[in-house]
């Protein structure tokens, strides 16, 4: 299981997501307020993740402590309304 900090942030915000893992890299896809988001982990000499959580229409690579950075952004979002 990879991207555990990110998964915990999504659970805290009650955001439903799909998790898959391939070649040792985690992948998360989810919707929030009608927009599709992704977090796709990679290992290319360094570990990182491609994501669009900072801007729904634009992907960017995050390296270093990418799980902390991405989960921090998700936790800053408003809570989901009940029933959403």
Listing of model-derived features with the role each one plays in the protein:
Residues 1-16:
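Amphipathic alpha-helical segments
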Residues 2, 61-63, 76:
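A diffuse structural propensity rather than consistent per-protein peaks
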Residues 13-47:
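Amphipathic, interaction-prone secondary-structure segments
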Residues 35-68, 72:
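Intrinsically disordered, low-complexity regulatory segments enriched in Ser/Thr/Pro
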Residues 77-84:
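Long, compositionally biased, intrinsically disordered regions
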């Amino acid at each position: 299981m990879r991207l555990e900090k990110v998964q915990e942030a999504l659970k805290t915000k009650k955001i439903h997501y799909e998790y898959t893992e391939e070649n040792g890299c985690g992948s998360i896809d989810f919707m929030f307020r009608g927009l599709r988001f992704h977090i796709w982990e990679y290992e290319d000499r360094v570990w990182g993740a491609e994501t669009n959580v900072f801007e729904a229409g634009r992907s960017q690579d995050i390296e270093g402590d990418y799980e902390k950075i991405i989960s921090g952004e998700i936790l800053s979002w408003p809570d989901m309304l009940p029933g959403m």
